[in-house]
């Protein structure tokens, strides 16, 4: 079972994503800010960091950079309504998928599955 760490500051979106991802069989741990995700990344293995970009205290890009330093094999997917603006700021983000809000749940699930299907085909899991 894939383990997903979700960092999303919008309460309703976070609850919705947790329920939906768990319903299709993923184990999801959710936090409402990037600073809460760091100790979890240090303590537990996760397959995917699913993070909003615009969050208080630590944005998703900084979180992804720190996650890559802590767990180099973790995959990253950004979910945001501000993808174009946030990623044009000239900051280096780890290789990641970007899913722009609003999105349909099936699109999110398909992207997660595609990320790990590619790895399975290349023998990385």
Regions found by a protein language model. Give the residues of each.
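C-terminal output helix
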Residues: 18, 103-116, 120-124
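Acidic catalytic/metal-coordinating carboxylates
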Residues: 33-36, 59-63
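Active-site residues of response regulator receiver
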Residues: 52
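Acidic, metal-coordinating helix/loop segments flanking the phosphotransfer/catalytic sites
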Residues: 18, 30-48
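Receiver (REC) domain active-site loop signature in two-component systems and cognate sites
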Residues: 55
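Conserved phosphotransfer cores of two-component systems
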Residues: 26, 42-44, 66-74, 85-94
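Two-component/phosphorelay signaling modules centered on CheY-like receiver
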Residues: 10-29, 96
């Amino acid at each position: 079972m894939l383990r997903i760490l979700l960092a999303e500051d919008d309460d309703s979106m976070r609850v919705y994503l947790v329920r939906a991802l768990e319903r299709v069989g993923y184990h999801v741990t959710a936090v409402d800010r990037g600073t809460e995700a760091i100790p979890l990344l240090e303590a537990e293995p996760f397959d995917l960091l699913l993070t909003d970009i615009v969050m208080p205290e630590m944005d998703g890009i900084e979180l992804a950079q720190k996650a890559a330093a802590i767990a180099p094999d973790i995959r990253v997917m950004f979910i945001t309504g501000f993808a174009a603006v946030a990623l044009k700021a000239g900051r280096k983000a780890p290789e990641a998928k970007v899913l722009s809000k609003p999105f349909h749940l099936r699109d999110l699930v398909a992207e997660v599955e595609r990320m790990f299907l590619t790895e399975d085909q290349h023998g990385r899991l």
